[in-house]
UniProtKB/Swiss-Prot annotation:
Required cofactor(s): Zn(2+)
Entries under Gene3D superfamilies matching the protein: DnaJ domain, Heat shock protein DnaJ, cysteine-rich domain, Urease metallochaperone UreE, N-terminal domain
Protein's name in the database: Chaperone protein DnaJ 1
Stored SUPFAM superfamilies: Chaperone J-domain (SSF46565), DnaJ/Hsp40 cysteine-rich domain (SSF57938), HSP40/DnaJ peptide-binding domain (SSF49493)
Entry function: Participates actively in the response to hyperosmotic and heat shock by preventing the aggregation of stress-denatured proteins and by disaggregating proteins, also in an autonomous, DnaK-independent fashion. Unfolded proteins bind initially to DnaJ; upon interaction with the DnaJ-bound protein, DnaK hydrolyzes its bound ATP, resulting in the formation of a stable complex. GrpE releases ADP from DnaK; ATP binding to DnaK triggers the release of the substrate protein, thus completing the reaction cycle.
Amino acid sequence: MAQREWVEKDFYQELGVSSDASPEEIKRAYRKLARDLHPDANPGNPAAGERFKAVSEAHNVLSDPAKRKEYDETRRLFAGGGFGGRRFDSGFGGGFGGFGVGGDGAEFNLNDLFDAASRTGGTTIGDLFGGLFGRGGSARPSRPRRGNDLETETELDFVEAAKGVAMPLRLTSPAPCTNCHGSGARPGTSPKVCPTCNGSGVINRNQGAFGFSEPCTDCRGSGSIIEHPCEECKGTGVTTRTRTINVRIPPGVEDGQRIRLAGQGEAGLRGAPSGDLYVTVHVRPDKIFGRDGDDLTVTVPVSFTELALGSTLSVPTLDGTVGVRVPKGTADGRILRVRGRGVPKRSGGSGDLLVTVKVAVPPNLAGAAQEALEAYAAAERSSGFNPRAGWAGNR
C-alpha cells in the first residue's frame, strides 16, 4: 500500500485494537477477523471479501515494525489539521493560491503529495518538500507500485515438518488478471505512453521564484494511458480470485516459523511486481517423536532385564527403524545417542536420534515369573546391593 493512502485509513480501527496494541494483540485480532471474513467462509458475500482485503492490508502494515513506525509518524504529521483538510497553506501569503495548478487557486491533494514523494525516490517529508520547492527539478519516471505482502497459515504433521513436504496452498487474494495478463488493457491492445508527460508521470511547473512538480492529471501519475481498459479488471491489471499454488516446505521447519515465498503475494497494479507471501507453519505434536533443535527424541519402554542384562532395541526413526544397543547395567532414564538419524539440517546432514529408555513395571506377576523374581530379590539382598546407598534422603 502506498503512503498516500495511510492518511485516509485507520488500520488500528480496522483490526479493532488500540494504537498502542502489542504485536501479539494485533496478531490475535487479525487471526480472528481473517477466520471470520475469509471468502471461503462467506461464499457469495462480496462485502466480506472487501472487508477481508482491508483487514489484510491493515495487518500487513501493523505487523511490520518498520511499516508501523512509518505509518504512525505519517498519521501524527497529518493529524489535527497539521496540513489542514484538502488545502495546503504555503505560508507565503496568497502567492501560491494553495499550490494550485497554474495559480488558479485549486486545492492541493494529499495523494499528489505522496505521489511526488514516490517519484523523487524520497521517503521522508523533508525530501518531499525539497522536491516541491525546486530542489532537484528534474522529473523521474514513476515507479510501478509493488503489491502488498500477504500472510497465511498452514498445519503440518510432525514428520512432514521434519522431512519437508510439497503441498498445495489455496488462498484468495488480488492476483494478476488472467484476461489481460496484468497489463490492464483489453486483449489485443496495450497501454500507450502518456503524451502530456512523455511517460514521466509528472508535470514541471514554475510559479514565481519557485518551481515544483505535480502528478500528470491525464495519466494520474502512471506515465501511461489505457485507451481500452480490460473488461475483467477495469484497467487495474488485478482481480481478486482464489488460486492454488504449490509450496515446498523445507526440511526441519519448526512450529511457528514463517516461510517467505517471493512474488506470491498480492499482485501490483498494471503489471507491477507482486508482493511476497509469508506462510506461518504450525506443527501438530506427534505421539512418538519429540524434537530438541535438530535432534529427534523418542522414549522407548523397556523391561528391567533388558537394562540389567543388556539388549538391542528396534527404535523408530523418520525413515524406518534402527537397532540401538543397550549396554549391560544401563540405568532407567538414560539417553542413548544415535548420530545422524535426527532432523535434517538446512546446512546439510542431520541431527542425532536421542533414545530415552524407561522401565515398564509389570502390573501383575504369577507362577514361575514371580518365583524367579523373588529368588532374584533374595540374591540381590545377599549381594549387598542397596539402591538407596548414599541417598540424601537417608536420615
